[in-house]
Amino acid sequence: MIKKRVFVSKNISNLSGRIGLKDNLFKQISENTLSEKPQDIKEIAKKHNLGVSTLHGAESFYEFLRPSHREKKAFVCNGSACMCAGTQEKLKDTLKEKLGNDKVGEMFCLGHCYENHAFHYDGENYAGKDIEKIDQIIKGEEIKQEKFFSKSFATTSFLMDDKLSSTDQFNDQLNKFLKTDKKEIVKSLLDSNLTGRGGAGFPTGMKWDFCSKAKGDKKYVICNADEGDSGAFSDRYLLEDQPLKVIFGMVMCGFVIGSDEGVLYIRGEYPKSIEAINGSINQLKKLGLLGENILGTDFSFDLGICIGQGAYICGEETALIASIEGRRAEVDVRPPFPVTEGLYKKPTVVNNVETLAAATGILINGSEKFSSIGNKKSAGTKLVCLDSFFNNPGVYEIDMGTPMKKIFNEIGGGYKETLKAFQIGGPLGGVVPLSEIENLNLDFR
């Protein structure tokens, strides 16, 4: 059964690969389903020599593409941070009163864990005291929204500094590194001891090196921006406040591995992130910093966005690849790993948002500074999200190896209520008794 499924998946991948990344099959399925006048799905299937059942199977997999979801007008966040805060039932009642009982649904974690009361309406996210202005929101009026608090407590900031906050800085750094030997870039990442920030902890330099040596007539770079864990909004911070850092990391990866195309898979629950990245990409293209023959070199690299449609599993790299290809987002058997057989069965690097931003920070600030923080297995700095139960909620850049007691009591300012335990690492993480913070540090081990 597994062999048959892998064989069928490979056929779909190859057929989907003929369409290419720019107008990928998942994008076509999503846009068609969400259109006011959808095309007969049989026509799309026929156009690409695919079975209708394949497209129906993919379409039915995603929450946002189901009729039951499309009939709603507003969605209340049901992430664990909002649920634990006890704000959502009253919020749901208010929205039902304004819009109707059958017009309010639920959506999983909108990344507003620092203020709660989160809900989604007409393509935008709202939270905190925004519900008090619901009449203005329904009328389509813009309202002032609170921004999450962010601050670096790191010895050296790699993720929150302003060294790549303008297109001029992007141009200067790109001009420098496109003249640098690719092996030197890989060596910098290896020497830094940077490991993947998405959870697996695989050495980033090693992943880039493996893919650079893989045989293939086409290679891809994917930014995994499907941040689905409740309580996490660090990727959202980087996408919205440090988009050039993330994009620069992708460009450098493309340069090293020999890729001319990349894609950011951003969850649909983050409309502001999609807007910020899209704006940055368009700006860089206008300046000739993305596209054909960048800065007059023979290196070409283009970027696009793929918008997730409500599937938590897409945070797993093989499920994410399946999604872009227009398949059901199901985890594939490994090996082969994406670095040798990834998107459309071509060598592919899949990196998390924070990993790419950290790679940029390392190239700009130096690998020695990064590796000197923390230890060999947990080096550098890490973004930590503290939700609304802390007196100082927000996203912070913190040295690896920092005691959890310091993070909770000094940086977080203690708690607004008496706590027994805390959740770490999202649904797949764990619940840890509060007493254990005396024995824990911020690291991967």
Feature map (PLM): residue ranges:
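Feature of Fe-S/electron-transfer and energy-metabolism proteins
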Residues: 1-445
